[in-house]
């Protein structure tokens, strides 16, 4: 089903086309939402129309409302089985109660999607793999992102990240990434998993969603992108990096570093977060 198909399936429950499209996006990508997100999506002020819509959701038992911290707003969880069945996702995990520590991530994910609600947003692994291996893209399965690049190139192992991918009318994909303040950021690993796919596409967009608390991290995000895509590693550098990593692994936890001049030069050259991340991915399973 496309986004339009899902909206048409939800509308018979008594919703306007605009409300139905919003609900379809919520159920596919978050399960929860705020009044301000609908107001932004609809291009209206957060007034009577918005409150009436959410009152209807609660009164018809399509959603449950929860008071947010300090009672500054209400969180709405869309859980009604028939609505999810209408969009062909009756077993969606988004129907289940959401842990408090996942709310911010879900809302940020929805914010990212609502930035371009007209895109056809792909949510599942199967949808993503089907789009990129068929049709106009025709990307070989071995070039799709996966956690273990050495694993067999099966499409069901591809796209381990849960972030949705939006598809524009011209076929250009928009890759979404949500930066979370409460967990170790895996942005570099995300970029590396997708690097081969990015290289095969004629055009693509990377959209990074940052919480307000991390607004100052924008420059850092840009620096990571420049590191990964604008500073390629040439074959000789890769060979030297592998040698250096192997020496580090042998040293282990002894904290004894050799006085070998080659090792000292390599340690100085590769003293950067980019290479630390590569080392931990290679030897520490992170």
Kindly give the residue locations of the regions a language model identified.
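Short, amphipathic alpha-helical interaction segments positioned at domain boundaries
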Residues: 79-106
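Glycine-rich, often proline-containing surface loops adjacent to acidic residues and nearby aromatics
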Residues: 32-34, 86-95, 170-176, 205
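C-terminal regulatory/effector modules of DNA-binding transcriptional regulators
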Residues: 169-286
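Hydrophobic, Leu/Ile/Phe/Ala-enriched alpha-helical segments that form helix-helix packing faces
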Residues: 26, 42, 54-58, 112-120, ...
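Exposed, interaction-prone assembly regions rather than primary DNA-binding/catalytic cores
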Residues: 97-188
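Short flexible/disordered coil segments
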Residues: 90-92, 127-144, 196-202, 271-281
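Basic, Lys/Arg-rich alpha-helical nucleic-acid-recognition elements, primarily the DNA-binding modules
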Residues: 1-86
């Amino acid at each position: 089903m496309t986004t339009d198909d899902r909206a048409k399936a939800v509308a018979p429950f008594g919703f306007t086309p605009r409300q139905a499209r919003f609900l379809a996006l919520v159920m596919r990508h978050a399960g929860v939402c705020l009044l301000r997100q609908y107001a932004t999506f609809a291009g209206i002020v957060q007034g009577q129309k918005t409150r009436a819509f959410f009152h209807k959701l609660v009164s018809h038992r399509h959603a449950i409302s929860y008071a947010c911290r300090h009672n500054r707003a209400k969180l709405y969880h869309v859980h009604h089985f028939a609505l999810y069945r209408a969009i062909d996702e009756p077993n969606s995990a988004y129907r289940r109660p959401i842990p408090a520590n996942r709310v911010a991530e879900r809302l940020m994910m929805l914010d990212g999607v609502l930035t371009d609600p007209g895109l056809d947003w792909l949510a599942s692994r199967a949808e993503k793999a089907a789009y990129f291996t068929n049709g106009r893209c025709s990307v070989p399965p071995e070039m799709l992102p996966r956690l273990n690049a050495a694993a067999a190139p099966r499409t069901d192992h591809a796209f381990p990240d849960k972030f949705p991918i939006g598809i524009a009318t011209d076929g250009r994909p928009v890759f979404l990434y949500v930066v979370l303040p409460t967990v170790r950021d895996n942005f570099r690993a995300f970029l590396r998993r997708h690097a081969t796919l990015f290289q095969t596409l004629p055009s693509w967009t990377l959209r990074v969603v940052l919480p307000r608390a991390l607004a100052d991290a924008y420059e850092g995000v840009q620096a990571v992108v420049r590191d990964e895509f604008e500073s390629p590693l040439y074959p000789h550098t890769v060979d030297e990096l592998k040698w250096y990593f192997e020496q580090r692994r042998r040293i282990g936890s002894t904290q004894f570093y050799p006085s070998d001049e080659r090792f000292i030069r390599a340690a100085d050259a590769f003293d950067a977060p980019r290479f630390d991340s590569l080392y931990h991915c290679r030897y520490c399973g992170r």
